[in-house]
């Protein structure tokens, strides 16, 4: 069974990056944190994870030098009560699992299913916790038109591929 690790912005619920691994608690997910930092263009102020050791190890590898200068907090002992929890991430994991079950799992690391789910989650799906707005809309990225999928496809087809 393959495991999906993902990064999500807490305020906007924007799915930033993902990594597929063969193991759940021992995979090196440092590349995930580094990719998230590159995509966001900056290091986060707080990283909220569960208590798995590989999250702490990856946090140290990806942010340790910056941690001293930028005071990045790593909260890894989350609880369901209170304002420090990872329920938003767990909800997204459930959303992914529901879809993955139907197609019988993620077979490859570069599965197009994951990119499609990421696009749907960020640009098409309205979120109840965001008052019906999309994650992209909350982040200030607007997709105009009635059919957001069609708009995204049309815009993608206009883009020139990178060499």
Where in this protein do the model-derived segments appear?
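Short, flexible loop/turn motifs enriched in small residues
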Residues: 1-3, 14
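Mobile genetic element proteins and their domesticated derivatives, centered on retroelements
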Residues: 7, 13, 33, 47-50, ...
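Active-site beta-loop-alpha junctions of metal-dependent nucleic acid enzymes
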Residues: 18-41
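Acidic/histidine-rich, metal-coordinating catalytic segments
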Residues: 43-55
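A short acidic (Asp/Glu
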Residues: 55-61
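Short hydrophobic/aromatic-enriched beta-strand-loop microsegments
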Residues: 66-77
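RNase H-like two-metal-ion nuclease catalytic core shared by retroviral integrases
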Residues: 75-98
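C-terminal domain-tail junction helix/linker
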Residues: 102-163
């Amino acid at each position: 069974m393959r495991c999906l690790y993902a990064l999500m912005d807490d305020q906007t619920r924007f799915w930033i990056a993902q990594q597929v691994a063969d193991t759940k608690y021992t995979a090196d997910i440092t590349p995930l944190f580094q990719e998230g930092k590159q995509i966001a263009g900056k290091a986060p102020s707080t990283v909220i994870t569960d208590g798995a050791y590989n999250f702490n190890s990856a946090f140290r590898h990806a942010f340790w030098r910056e941690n001293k200068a930028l005071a990045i907090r790593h909260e890894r002992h989350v609880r369901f009560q209170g304002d420090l929890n990872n329920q938003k991430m767990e909800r997204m994991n459930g959303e992914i699992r529901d879809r993955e079950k139907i197609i019988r799992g993620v077979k490859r690391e570069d599965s197009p299913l994951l990119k499609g789910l990421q696009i749907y989650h960020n640009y098409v799906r309205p979120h109840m916790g965001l008052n019906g707005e999309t994650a992209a809309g909350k982040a200030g990225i607007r997709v105009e038109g009635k059919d957001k999928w069609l708009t995204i496809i049309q815009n993608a087809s206009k883009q020139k591929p990178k060499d």
